[in-house]
């Protein structure tokens, strides 16, 4: 996105439409202006995503950290995922939106480098957190008697993820620059002391190599691995359902398994769908930016970027809709009440990885053996 502006300004004559009292850049054709109604709608949409992303992920993090009973491998990874989403909602969303509309950077050199860096780090952390969750689910369901990750493994995995994310995102810090070069040949006073922020790699081949690597590392590679894991989980759960048909209360377990299956894939599918438009947009622009009409670029980018940023709201939405325990805790959170252990209120579904559980985020379906243990202890807690 940032490099697009440079080529756009470089190849078009610029004029300032003072009659509209707008700081937005206008090019040869007034059609390049986004209508005020569109800008207002986009601003409302971005504002809603920021509010929901910040409040939802913050509530999710606080609730899980407040409840010691919820500190298991999956929830630790969910907190990590929510933290990266929270970071993007605060550090990237507002700046990218304003920059795309204004077509010049007003937030200084530090934010110029931090904005793409944080976003790149976040998507790497998010996708590999989902990978670790898939690995944990796979081990607990496919190979319950084999190696199973514990909380210590989760913390080690998170550390490795952040190191990998920071390392893979460093080129943005190195090659992202703040410059007035596109405006140097513009004589209008309106563009004096205006700067743009974009990545300037040593060559196009370097940039293409890096962006292609990110495409594989951050999207296609991890998602393929995740879907393979969950496909194997689905097959195993389907076979288990057939066995449960012969067991008492199989109807209850079947409905719980169905809900858990939805939870297993919901966040992953939402992540893949949300990021797909921006991934396609960036790939097309990197390889042949002339395909995208100049006047359509900003609007198209904002729509794709907004769709991707909706992924920052996915965690609290799915967590809340599919987890009654989270809904109860959320009521306590907004009522400023203490987070106390409520054994009688919680669903009797094993959550801890010590119970050979089967699930994705806050809900886990216990094995038949675990169900027997649960029935013997009504105070077992999610």
Swiss-Prot record:
A Gene Ontology BP annotation from the UniProt entry: regulation of blood pressure
Transmembrane segments: 34-54, 76-96, 116-136, 154-174, 211-231, 260-280, 299-319
Intrachain disulfide bonds: 112-197
Expressing tissues: The alpha form is highly expressed in the brain, heart, kidney, spleen, skeletal muscle, and lung, whereas the beta receptor mRNA was not detected in these tissues. However, the beta form is expressed in mouse embryonic developmental stage (7 and 11 days), bone marrow cells and several hematopoietic cell lines.
Compartment(s) where it occurs, according to its Swiss-Prot or TrEMBL record: Cell membrane
Predominant place of localization: membrane
GO terms for cellular component: plasma membrane
Job description of the protein: Receptor for neuropeptide Y and peptide YY.
Name assigned to this protein: Neuropeptide Y receptor type 1
Annotated organism of origin: Mus musculus (Mouse)
Gene for this chain: Npy1r
């Amino acid at each position: 996105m940032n490099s697009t502006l440079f080529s756009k300004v470089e190849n078009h004559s610029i004029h300032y439409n003072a009659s509209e009292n707008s700081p937005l850049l206008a090019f040869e054709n007034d059609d390049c202006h986004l209508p005020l109604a569109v800008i207002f709608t986009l601003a409302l949409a971005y504002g809603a995503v920021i509010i929901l992303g910040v409040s939802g992920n913050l509530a999710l993090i606080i609730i899980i950290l407040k409840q010691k009973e919820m500190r298991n491998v999956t929830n630790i990874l969910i907190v990590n995922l929510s933290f990266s989403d929270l970071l993007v909602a605060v550090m990237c969303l507002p700046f990218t939106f304003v920059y795309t509309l204004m077509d010049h950077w007003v937030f200084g050199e530090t934010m110029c480098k931090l904005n793409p860096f944080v976003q790149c780090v976040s998507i790497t952390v998010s996708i590999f957190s989902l990978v670790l969750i898939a690995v944990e689910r796979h081990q607990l369901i496919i190979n319950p008697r084999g190696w199973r990750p514990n909380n210590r493994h989760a913390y080690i995995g998170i550390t490795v993820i952040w190191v990998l994310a920071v390392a893979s995102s460093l080129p943005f810090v190195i090659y992202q620059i703040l410059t007035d070069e596109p405006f140097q040949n513009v004589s209008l006073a309106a563009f004096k002391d205006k700067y743009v922020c974009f990545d300037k790699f040593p060559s196009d081949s370097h940039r293409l190599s890096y962006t292609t690597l990110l495409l594989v590392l951050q999207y296609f590679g991890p998602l393929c691995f995740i879907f393979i894991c969950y496909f194997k989980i689905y097959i195993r759960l389907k076979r288990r359902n057939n066995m449960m048909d012969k067991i008492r209360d199989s109807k209850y377990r079947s409905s719980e398994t169905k809900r858990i299956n939805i939870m297993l894939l919901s966040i992953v599918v939402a992540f893949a769908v949300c990021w797909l438009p921006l991934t396609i947009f960036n790939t097309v622009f990197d390889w042949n930016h002339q395909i995208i009409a100049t006047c359509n670029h900003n609007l198209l980018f904002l729509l794709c970027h907004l769709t991707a940023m909706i992924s920052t709201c996915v965690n609290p939405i799915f967590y809340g809709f599919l987890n009654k325990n989270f809904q109860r805790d959320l009521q306590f959170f907004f009522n400023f009440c203490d987070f106390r252990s409520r054994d009688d209120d919680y669903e009797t579904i094993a959550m801890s990885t010590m119970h050979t559980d089967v699930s994705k985020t806050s809900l886990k379906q216990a094995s038949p053996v675990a169900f027997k243990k649960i029935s013997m202890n009504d105070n077992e807690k999610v």
